[in-house]
Amino acid sequence: MSSDIKIKVQSFGRFLSNMVMPNIGAFIAWGIITALFIPTGWLPNETLAKLVGPMITYLLPLLIGYTGGKLVGGERGGVVGAITTMGVIVGADMPMFLGSMIAGPLGGWCIKHFDRWVDGKIKSGFEMLVNNFSAGIIGMILAILAFLGIGPIVEALSKMLAAGVNFMVVHDMLPLASIFVEPAKILFLNNAINHGIFSPLGIQQSHELGKSIFFLIEANPGPGMGVLLAYMFFGRGSAKQSAGGAAIIHFLGGIHEIYFPYVLMNPRLILAVILGGMTGVFTLTILGGGLVSPASPGSILAVLAMTPKGAYFANIAGVCAAMAVSFVVSAILLKTSKVKEEDDIEAATRRMQDMKAESKGASPLSAGDVTNDLSHVRKIIVACDAGMGSSAMGAGVLRKKIQDAGLSQISVTNSAINNLPPDVDLVITHRDLTERAMRQVPQAQHISLTNFLDSGLYTSLTERLVAAQRHTANEEKVKDSLKDSFDDSSANLFKLGAENIFLGRKAATKEEAIRFAGEQLVKGGYVEPEYVQAMLDREKLTPTYLGESIAVPHGTVEAKDRVLKTGVVFCQYPEGVRFGEEEDDIARLVIGIAARNNEHIQVITSLTNALDDESVIERLAHTTSVDEVLELLAGRK
């Protein structure tokens, strides 16, 4: 599946589930009332059972319609969406969940486009009149159209779907649904499948039969639990160590996303969850299992809470059978894996890349065209598809580390990707969702991960945030302490001429590049010849590679008396020179510095400000124009 198609499918599924998930509390309330008070319930009560019909016929579809309209057209969209949904409800003889998913967004879309059309055209004093009557008239028209057209069409469509489902049930084909459901879950379509497809079908079946198997096709925690148990006994390295905690969160907490990375780590395990899912559905079909309402989240506790009287054995058997088959298949696949230590190698490789990125001042597993300066970060959001389970746990882990580090000015929360606010500074998402997040808030920095409970990544990020905040604080302290002798005008101090710029250079070693920069400082009258050796001596103490293709060689403290006046030479090495300790610590911009007293602090600060943009660095590394270099360093970009 291509990236664009996957994002579109995720977005559409996300939209469907966004209409249902905010109203899950209402579904659960209806499910509990049904389980308790209907004639076959735990506490049969003819009076209280009268709540069941109106809630499923009117309340739940209206809530979905209102939410769908609000998603598209705001508050006014929600009102018109609810009015339109009422037309669908009255126009059909069955609960209109699918109809409300069409009518609600349609109402929101119509009022949204009407508001755009009249924007700026309403005379002063008539705004409230137009707003109220437009919503009423458009809602009336859409309700009539929904009553006459959408309702009957959706009713016919629902009957066709029901016939198809009944065909699958009668011919014992329902387990085949797991072939599509389980892989789709791994692509983070689990909420879309459960709340966008199975919940509407399940509610209708539950209303007729008192329970529905559809609520357990996707929500069954058995297949994922089997995979995690297999990792606990037969996994290796960090995957084995973390599987126990993940199993508790998955099985009791109902956060299914927690096991996705374990399957992605070894894609062959998709076969295990498919076979486990098929076994679970088959067992539920044979034994007559099902729930009265959606189990959200998909925890064994939620499953038991939504189980009607007489279905406990069937539901528990369905979960256990799915878990057992998934465990056996996963164990076989893990034990016979041709690539030994596969999960360890991938984890170690990612950790190595994270640590290397950290050492060079880059975000671990950062994605997109973003800056790596974290000094401005004040708002961090851990985002997932639904903005609930997995991201909430990740945000909790990171929040504790941030608080323990004393970074009280930084807030850490969780959110659904579609609800990311424009003022977020840093977004953390699963790697399969990062592209969607970048489209939602392109101005923010983005970090990808493969496991929302990756403590190592959060520790690395916290350390970088601490370092960035400390650097900013130290810079302010330096400026305050030197303000009397400090000239904040970079034009007075940091002023390059064409004679200080050397383009298209080549060097085999960093010593050769440093020696050339030193010789140019001597020729420019900035330093005495002995300063060149002091620059080489300084490099032996600690590499002067800053990261981002920049090195700033300069002399030792003892050589300051060899500086005649503050000066800078800019040397470009398009092919690069290795300056750092790592093989890819390649400098393309070598900036030799000589400064008297504390003036080097001002010089470095000025350079940092000028080279704060990655695109500027890229242009400086390849330009053949001295004038362009002068303009870029002067900030005239």
Curated annotation (Swiss-Prot):
This is PTS system mannitol-specific EIICBA component. It catalyses: D-mannitol(out) + N(pros)-phospho-L-histidyl-[protein] = D-mannitol 1-phosphate(in) + L-histidyl-[protein]. GO terms for biological process: mannitol transmembrane transport; phosphoenolpyruvate-dependent sugar phosphotransferase system; sorbitol transmembrane transport. InterPro entries: PTrfase/Anion_transptr, PTS_EIIA_type-2_dom, PTS_EIIB-like_sf, PTS_EIIB_2, PTS_EIIB_2/3, PTS_EIIB_mannitol, PTS_EIIC, PTS_EIIC_2. It comes from Escherichia coli (strain K12). It holds the Pfam family PTS_EIIC. The keyword Phosphoprotein applies. Induction: Induced by mannitol. Repressed by MltR. Residues 1-23, 71-133, 186-272, 335-637 are cytoplasmic. One of its GO terms (molecular function) is protein-phosphocysteine-mannitol phosphotransferase system transporter activity.
